[in-house]
Amino acid sequence: MNIYLHVEVALRELDSKLLLGVIAASRGHQVLISDISEIERGLRRGILNPGIFHTKSITPSEHKINFHKRLIDKKFLVTSLDEEAGLELSDEKLREYLNDRASKKTIRQSSAVFCWGDDDLQILKNINFKNRSNIIKTGSPRVDLWKSIFLNYWGRPNKKPKKPFL
């Protein structure tokens, strides 16, 4: 299977996309990690074979909806995991945030919408109340990178951060 991993902000997303890509490649998949402009260019030129397009959000903009439709029409599957999870928001603010980040239409365009945890899972299921089976709690590979197995990759911090951060 061809897997296309969309990176918007490399500093924030590249390590986790590399983790996903390495795991997928080790299982026999072909993986391309790229920004959206190069993926769009490859699609226009007809050089990308159908596969899974995994994006960093399904914000319901006209451009994104049309791009996902072109992918689907060319037999791609669209999946997403929102990179900006809104973890520190109150329930009401998280609901508002996710309503801006997803819509019934963009959820329905997606073969799978992956969630960080129970809060975003429930809110996204409420947005797309007719078909909830494509909304799945998986956690985030960004958080997986915090595990002790990756300590050699990151190294030990010289000092403890002053405030919580992601």
Place the predicted regions along the sequence by residue:
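Conserved donor-binding/catalytic core segment of Leloir-type glycosyltransferases
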Residues: 160-166
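Active-site and donor-binding regions of nucleotide-sugar-utilizing enzymes
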Residues: 2-158
